[in-house]
């Protein structure tokens, strides 16, 4: 199963398997119809008739939706009735084509049911009305999820963009300078290669406490980084601050880094606790995973930010499980330092040894008394 590099439980975006399965179904049905001995032109005519009937049923459904949308034409469509019609029925050329196809393909067929066209049309409208009243055509949860992901309509996707634009994009470009200033006043505490980033914690259960030491006593608050101020949304000199934490192992300091939770996860957790939001625990878990994946994709296209932070995604086991948040952070710190060393060694390997290069300009002097001409045909 495909999953993100952040955590095994975070899925990748949906692919095109549904359309591939539909293509296989189409092929199988055509083979079955061919084996039944029907002529190809009859198969094509019946296929077009049924396809036009299905689309005509969707047209009836769109008309029913239009009746409701006309009540909101000023608030939802800026007073444009044409926009309301397009939102419910789609392109008018398409609707007219479907009506013509329905009439055209109904005419040449023998009337096996002995029903006139108006009866057939009325029965089609009746079946569509019953489907609407009984909610027989509601989208499946997987279809709703796919549509929302494809159009960036999920709660988590909006939160991820808000977290990036309203926070990370403001503080991450200037983070190295603030860490450098901090090191000058605190004995170069954040000297490791992995300590020059902001580590953002992503618990998939959305449990975000305000005190990290309550989660793990081996995480100890040390200091705050130098403040960053910026004018934001009418607020003059808005203050942004980040905290430096020390990581302990067997009572001894083994590392330090700039650390914090992803604050939008608190909102997801609060929504799941409020009945007015209609947000279940399953919805919360799905949106938390999507939040992580969306933020990862956003940072991947932001070079000025992606090298200044690392996402620490984890899922605490059930009761009785052995999980240490400090050890999880240490693992990411060591991995970051290992990757930095690997990159540095790769850069060093492609650079020539300075001792092998000439230290100054050299003059190449010929032993001949007269200079040679540029032409070679004089010899």
UniProtKB/Swiss-Prot annotation:
Residues 340-379 are annotated as: C-terminal tail (CTT). Changing residue 358 to S: Restores STING1 ability to induce a strong inflammatory response, resulting in type-I interferon activation and virus inhibition. It catalyses: H(+)(in) = H(+)(out). GO terms for molecular function: 2',3'-cyclic GMP-AMP binding; cyclic-di-GMP binding; proton channel activity; signaling adaptor activity. The keyword Phosphoprotein applies. It is a multi-pass membrane protein. It is found in: Endoplasmic reticulum membrane; Cytoplasm, Perinuclear region; Endoplasmic reticulum-Golgi intermediate compartment membrane; Golgi apparatus membrane. InterPro entries: STING, STING_C_chordates, STING_C_sf, STING_LBD, STING_TM. Phosphorylation by TBK1 leads to activation and production of IFN-beta. Following cyclic nucleotide (c-di-GMP or cGAMP)-binding, activation and translocation from the endoplasmic reticulum, STING1 is phosphorylated by TBK1 at Ser-366 in the pLxIS motif. The phosphorylated pLxIS motif constitutes an IRF3-binding motif, leading to recruitment of the transcription factor IRF3 to induce type-I interferons and other cytokines. In contrast, lacks phosphorylation site at position 358, leading to reduced production of type-I interferons and other cytokines. Residues 153-340 are annotated as: Cyclic dinucleotide-binding domain (CBD). The modification Phosphoserine is found at residues 355, 366. The keyword Protein transport does not apply. A lipid is attached at residues 88, 91 (S-palmitoyl cysteine). Signal peptide: none annotated. 2',3'-cGAMP binds at residues 162, 167, 238, 263. The record marks 358 as: Not phosphorylated. It comes from the Eukaryota. 2',3'-cUAMP binds at residues 167, 238, 263. Its main location: endoplasmic reticulum. GO terms for cellular component: autophagosome membrane; cytoplasmic vesicle; endoplasmic reticulum membrane; endoplasmic reticulum-Golgi intermediate compartment membrane; Golgi membrane; mitochondrial outer membrane; perinuclear region of cytoplasm; plasma membrane. Coiled coil: none annotated. 3',3'-c-di-GMP binds at residues 162, 167, 238-241, 263. GO terms for biological process: autophagosome assembly; cGAS/STING signaling pathway; defense response to virus; innate immune response; positive regulation of macroautophagy; positive regulation of type I interferon production; reticulophagy. In absence of cGAMP, the transmembrane and cytoplasmic regions interact to form an integrated, domain-swapped dimeric assembly. In absence of cyclic nucleotide (c-di-GMP or cGAMP), the protein is autoinhibited by an intramolecular interaction between the cyclic dinucleotide-binding domain (CBD) and the C-terminal tail (CTT). Following cGAMP-binding, the cyclic dinucleotide-binding domain (CBD) is closed, leading to a 180 degrees rotation of the CBD domain relative to the transmembrane domain. The pLxIS motif constitutes an IRF3-binding motif: following phosphorylation by TBK1, the phosphorylated pLxIS motif of STING1 recruits IRF3. IRF3 is then phosphorylated and activated by TBK1 to induce type-I interferons and other cytokines. PANTHER family: STIMULATOR OF INTERFERON GENES PROTEIN. This is Stimulator of interferon genes protein. The gene is STING1.
